[in-house]
């Protein structure tokens, strides 16, 4: 399981607001292409690894406002579990994020690309959290997501 921590120069409530919905994960997690909300507790994740598309459904198993957010895979061709913990710092003016993420295959040996994807989770999670911190502290978190969506639309045309 990959684990990374980062401190953000924003109040806890603002940081939690940006991280408590998996639909927003592609805004900073470079290896997640898309997340679709199925209902209030269920989300479909989609990513491309090598030549293969991976899809999996997750359920939110813990959502304690401004404290903790967690999910598990319920079906799909890739198993993902994650937990995000939020800790206020400096009388609430800053926030520490503790992010744990794990990927596993449901069956058989992974392809070379999938094995690399799983093996590099910790390093990539650190890069993703650095990107998140920069975007959220600069107030560009939502803007970068819109630009990314526009780029995907243009390349699809």
Model-predicted segments: where are they?
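Beta-strand/loop substructures that line and gate deep hydrophobic ligand-binding cavities in soluble
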Residues: 74-127, 134, 138, 143-150, ...
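Residue-level preference for beta-strand/loop junctions
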Residues: 39-41, 52, 78, 93
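Hydrophobic pocket/interface hotspot
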Residues: 15-19, 25, 43, 60, ...
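Short, cysteine-centered beta-strand-loop-beta hairpins and adjacent loop/turn segments enriched
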Residues: 48-57, 105-109
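Short beta-strand micro-motifs enriched in acidic
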Residues: 38, 61-63, 85-91
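Short, surface-exposed coil-to-beta transition loops
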Residues: 1-3, 53-57, 78-83
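Short, hydrophobic/aromatic-rich segments at coil-to-beta transitions
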Residues: 37-44, 63-71
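Hydrophobic ligand-binding cavity/cleft-lining segments
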Residues: 1-42, 154-157
